[in-house]
Amino acid sequence: MRDQYAGDVSDVLKFAFLRALAGKDRTLGIAWYYAPGDDGRSDGRHLEWRDETAWRVLDEELHTGLAALPERSVAALERAMIWPEAALFHREPMPPRAGRSAWGIRKRSALDSADIVFLDPENGIGEETEKHATFSEIRLLRKPGRAIVFITFPGRSMKHDALLQQLHERLAVETDAENIITLRTNVSVPAAERPRSYVQRQRWFTFIDPDAELIARARAFASNLTCIPRVRAVLDGIA
Protein backbone atom coordinates (compact mmCIF):
# COMPACT_ATOMS: atom_id res chain seq x y z
CA MET A 1 0.00 0.00 0.00
CA ARG A 2 1.26 3.46 -0.93
CA ASP A 3 0.10 6.87 0.24
CA GLN A 4 -0.90 7.86 -3.29
CA TYR A 5 -3.61 5.18 -3.32
CA ALA A 6 -5.36 6.36 -0.14
CA GLY A 7 -9.02 7.14 -0.74
CA ASP A 8 -9.23 5.61 -4.21
CA VAL A 9 -12.33 3.62 -5.17
CA SER A 10 -10.46 0.43 -4.29
CA ASP A 11 -10.21 1.70 -0.71
CA VAL A 12 -13.95 2.29 -0.56
CA LEU A 13 -14.51 -1.25 -1.79
CA LYS A 14 -12.07 -3.01 0.54
CA PHE A 15 -12.88 -0.97 3.65
CA ALA A 16 -16.62 -1.38 3.14
CA PHE A 17 -16.04 -5.12 2.88
CA LEU A 18 -13.88 -5.25 6.01
CA ARG A 19 -16.40 -3.19 7.97
CA ALA A 20 -19.17 -5.53 6.88
CA LEU A 21 -17.12 -8.54 7.98
CA ALA A 22 -16.08 -7.12 11.34
CA GLY A 23 -19.52 -5.87 12.33
CA LYS A 24 -19.69 -5.00 16.03
CA ASP A 25 -18.16 -8.22 17.34
CA ARG A 26 -14.84 -8.82 15.54
CA THR A 27 -11.54 -7.03 16.04
CA LEU A 28 -9.98 -5.97 12.75
CA GLY A 29 -6.24 -5.88 12.08
CA ILE A 30 -4.70 -4.22 9.00
CA ALA A 31 -1.27 -5.21 7.69
CA TRP A 32 -0.59 -2.42 5.22
CA TYR A 33 2.60 -3.74 3.61
CA TYR A 34 3.46 -0.07 3.53
CA ALA A 35 5.76 1.27 0.81
CA PRO A 36 6.66 4.95 1.36
CA GLY A 37 6.96 7.29 -1.59
CA ASP A 38 5.20 7.78 -4.90
CA ASP A 39 6.00 5.22 -7.60
CA GLY A 40 5.06 7.62 -10.40
CA ARG A 41 2.11 5.58 -11.61
CA SER A 42 -1.37 7.01 -12.11
CA ASP A 43 -2.99 4.39 -9.87
CA GLY A 44 -5.13 5.85 -7.13
CA ARG A 45 -6.69 8.66 -9.13
CA HIS A 46 -10.26 7.32 -9.17
CA LEU A 47 -12.30 9.46 -6.78
CA GLU A 48 -15.57 9.46 -8.73
CA TRP A 49 -17.20 7.50 -5.90
CA ARG A 50 -17.44 10.73 -3.89
CA ASP A 51 -20.20 11.96 -6.20
CA GLU A 52 -22.02 8.65 -6.70
CA THR A 53 -25.00 8.07 -4.42
CA ALA A 54 -24.80 4.28 -4.63
CA TRP A 55 -21.40 4.20 -2.91
CA ARG A 56 -22.79 6.36 -0.11
CA VAL A 57 -25.75 4.03 0.31
CA LEU A 58 -23.41 1.03 0.54
CA ASP A 59 -21.77 2.46 3.69
CA GLU A 60 -22.60 6.06 4.56
CA GLU A 61 -20.27 6.30 7.55
CA LEU A 62 -17.34 5.08 5.47
CA HIS A 63 -18.23 7.37 2.57
CA THR A 64 -18.30 10.41 4.87
CA GLY A 65 -15.05 9.48 6.59
CA LEU A 66 -13.06 8.82 3.43
CA ALA A 67 -14.39 11.91 1.65
CA ALA A 68 -13.13 14.01 4.57
CA LEU A 69 -9.53 12.75 4.49
CA PRO A 70 -7.27 15.77 5.09
CA GLU A 71 -4.52 14.22 2.98
CA ARG A 72 -3.96 11.13 0.91
CA SER A 73 -1.81 8.97 3.13
CA VAL A 74 -1.96 5.69 5.01
CA ALA A 75 -1.45 7.59 8.28
CA ALA A 76 -4.53 9.69 7.51
CA LEU A 77 -6.50 6.53 6.80
CA GLU A 78 -5.61 5.15 10.22
CA ARG A 79 -6.82 8.36 11.89
CA ALA A 80 -10.08 8.48 9.93
CA MET A 81 -13.35 7.73 11.71
CA ILE A 82 -14.04 4.68 9.59
CA TRP A 83 -12.77 1.75 11.64
CA PRO A 84 -14.54 -0.68 13.93
CA GLU A 85 -13.72 -0.22 17.60
CA ALA A 86 -10.22 -1.30 18.67
CA ALA A 87 -8.93 -1.80 15.11
CA LEU A 88 -5.20 -2.55 14.93
CA PHE A 89 -2.64 -1.46 12.34
CA HIS A 90 0.86 -2.44 11.25
CA ARG A 91 2.42 0.34 9.15
CA GLU A 92 6.11 -0.41 9.49
CA PRO A 93 7.61 0.06 6.00
CA MET A 94 8.49 -3.00 3.98
CA PRO A 95 12.12 -3.94 4.77
CA PRO A 96 14.88 -5.33 2.54
CA ARG A 97 14.71 -9.10 2.16
CA ALA A 98 17.27 -9.73 4.92
CA GLY A 99 15.03 -8.04 7.48
CA ARG A 100 11.75 -9.50 6.35
CA SER A 101 11.51 -12.39 8.79
CA ALA A 102 11.92 -10.13 11.84
CA TRP A 103 9.50 -7.62 10.28
CA GLY A 104 6.93 -10.40 9.90
CA ILE A 105 7.26 -11.36 13.56
CA ARG A 106 6.74 -7.73 14.61
CA LYS A 107 3.67 -7.59 12.37
CA ARG A 108 2.25 -10.70 14.01
CA SER A 109 2.81 -9.19 17.45
CA ALA A 110 1.16 -5.87 16.51
CA LEU A 111 -1.96 -7.66 15.25
CA ASP A 112 -2.04 -10.42 17.85
CA SER A 113 -5.52 -9.69 19.23
CA ALA A 114 -7.21 -9.31 15.83
CA ASP A 115 -9.99 -11.72 14.88
CA ILE A 116 -9.74 -10.72 11.21
CA VAL A 117 -6.38 -9.80 9.67
CA PHE A 118 -6.33 -8.08 6.28
CA LEU A 119 -3.16 -8.11 4.17
CA ASP A 120 -2.89 -5.19 1.74
CA PRO A 121 0.20 -5.77 -0.43
CA GLU A 122 0.58 -3.74 -3.60
CA ASN A 123 0.53 -6.76 -5.93
CA GLY A 124 -1.11 -9.56 -3.94
CA ILE A 125 0.54 -12.87 -3.05
CA GLY A 126 3.86 -13.80 -4.60
CA GLU A 127 7.59 -13.82 -4.09
CA GLU A 128 9.38 -12.11 -1.21
CA THR A 129 9.38 -8.59 -2.69
CA GLU A 130 8.15 -5.24 -1.36
CA LYS A 131 5.05 -5.58 -3.55
CA HIS A 132 3.89 -8.99 -2.34
CA ALA A 133 2.75 -10.86 0.72
CA THR A 134 3.99 -14.44 0.93
CA PHE A 135 2.49 -17.81 1.79
CA SER A 136 4.89 -18.12 4.73
CA GLU A 137 3.56 -14.85 6.16
CA ILE A 138 0.02 -16.18 5.94
CA ARG A 139 1.10 -19.31 7.80
CA LEU A 140 2.72 -17.17 10.48
CA LEU A 141 -0.49 -15.19 11.03
CA ARG A 142 -2.90 -18.12 11.19
CA LYS A 143 -4.30 -19.15 14.55
CA PRO A 144 -7.55 -20.69 15.86
CA GLY A 145 -10.52 -18.35 15.72
CA ARG A 146 -8.89 -15.96 13.25
CA ALA A 147 -9.73 -15.35 9.60
CA ILE A 148 -7.15 -13.92 7.20
CA VAL A 149 -8.17 -11.89 4.17
CA PHE A 150 -5.86 -10.66 1.43
CA ILE A 151 -6.23 -8.75 -1.80
CA THR A 152 -5.27 -10.22 -5.18
CA PHE A 153 -5.03 -8.55 -8.58
CA PRO A 154 -5.81 -11.23 -11.19
CA GLY A 155 -3.74 -11.10 -14.34
CA ARG A 156 -4.40 -12.33 -17.85
CA SER A 157 -2.11 -15.34 -17.84
CA MET A 158 -5.09 -17.73 -17.83
CA LYS A 159 -8.86 -17.73 -17.55
CA HIS A 160 -9.93 -16.40 -14.19
CA ASP A 161 -11.83 -19.53 -13.14
CA ALA A 162 -8.66 -21.55 -13.64
CA LEU A 163 -6.57 -18.89 -11.91
CA LEU A 164 -8.90 -18.95 -8.90
CA GLN A 165 -8.76 -22.73 -8.67
CA GLN A 166 -4.96 -22.58 -8.84
CA LEU A 167 -4.88 -19.97 -6.06
CA HIS A 168 -7.14 -21.97 -3.76
CA GLU A 169 -5.21 -25.19 -4.37
CA ARG A 170 -1.88 -23.48 -3.71
CA LEU A 171 -3.19 -21.92 -0.51
CA ALA A 172 -4.43 -25.29 0.73
CA VAL A 173 -0.97 -26.78 0.18
CA GLU A 174 1.09 -23.85 1.47
CA THR A 175 -1.01 -22.92 4.53
CA ASP A 176 -2.85 -26.17 5.38
CA ALA A 177 -6.13 -24.23 5.33
CA GLU A 178 -9.24 -26.25 4.55
CA ASN A 179 -11.76 -23.42 4.27
CA ILE A 180 -10.92 -20.90 1.53
CA ILE A 181 -13.30 -18.57 -0.31
CA THR A 182 -12.82 -15.58 -2.60
CA LEU A 183 -14.96 -12.53 -3.30
CA ARG A 184 -14.31 -11.55 -6.91
CA THR A 185 -15.16 -7.93 -7.72
CA ASN A 186 -15.13 -5.94 -10.93
CA VAL A 187 -15.49 -2.14 -10.86
CA SER A 188 -15.61 -0.17 -14.12
CA VAL A 189 -13.91 3.24 -13.84
CA PRO A 190 -13.48 6.08 -16.38
CA ALA A 191 -10.55 5.62 -18.76
CA ALA A 192 -7.86 8.29 -18.39
CA GLU A 193 -7.63 9.05 -22.10
CA ARG A 194 -11.36 8.64 -22.82
CA PRO A 195 -13.43 9.90 -19.85
CA ARG A 196 -16.68 8.68 -21.39
CA SER A 197 -15.29 5.17 -21.73
CA TYR A 198 -14.68 2.71 -18.93
CA VAL A 199 -12.00 0.21 -18.00
CA GLN A 200 -12.42 -2.71 -15.64
CA ARG A 201 -10.58 -2.94 -12.34
CA GLN A 202 -10.69 -6.41 -10.85
CA ARG A 203 -9.96 -7.01 -7.21
CA TRP A 204 -10.23 -10.35 -5.45
CA PHE A 205 -10.50 -10.73 -1.69
CA THR A 206 -9.56 -14.20 -0.52
CA PHE A 207 -10.44 -15.55 2.95
CA ILE A 208 -8.63 -18.22 4.84
CA ASP A 209 -10.43 -19.86 7.78
CA PRO A 210 -13.73 -17.93 7.68
CA ASP A 211 -16.44 -19.23 9.99
CA ALA A 212 -20.10 -19.58 9.00
CA GLU A 213 -20.99 -16.08 10.21
CA LEU A 214 -18.22 -14.43 8.19
CA ILE A 215 -19.29 -16.34 5.09
CA ALA A 216 -22.86 -15.12 5.60
CA ARG A 217 -21.63 -11.54 5.97
CA ALA A 218 -19.52 -11.86 2.82
CA ARG A 219 -22.49 -13.23 0.90
CA ALA A 220 -24.68 -10.31 2.02
CA PHE A 221 -21.98 -7.80 1.06
CA ALA A 222 -21.60 -9.33 -2.40
CA SER A 223 -25.35 -8.98 -2.90
CA ASN A 224 -25.26 -5.33 -1.81
CA LEU A 225 -22.41 -4.56 -4.23
CA THR A 226 -24.52 -5.56 -7.21
CA CYS A 227 -26.77 -2.57 -6.51
CA ILE A 228 -23.94 -0.19 -7.46
CA PRO A 229 -23.77 0.78 -11.15
CA ARG A 230 -20.83 -0.74 -13.07
CA VAL A 231 -19.93 -3.09 -10.20
CA ARG A 232 -20.08 -6.89 -10.28
CA ALA A 233 -19.32 -9.32 -7.47
CA VAL A 234 -19.43 -13.08 -6.94
CA LEU A 235 -18.45 -15.23 -3.97
CA ASP A 236 -16.58 -18.43 -4.90
CA GLY A 237 -15.42 -21.49 -3.03
CA ILE A 238 -18.40 -22.07 -0.73
CA ALA A 239 -18.97 -25.79 -0.24
Model regions and ranges:
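Class I S-adenosyl-L-methionine-dependent methyltransferase catalytic core
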Residues: 1-239
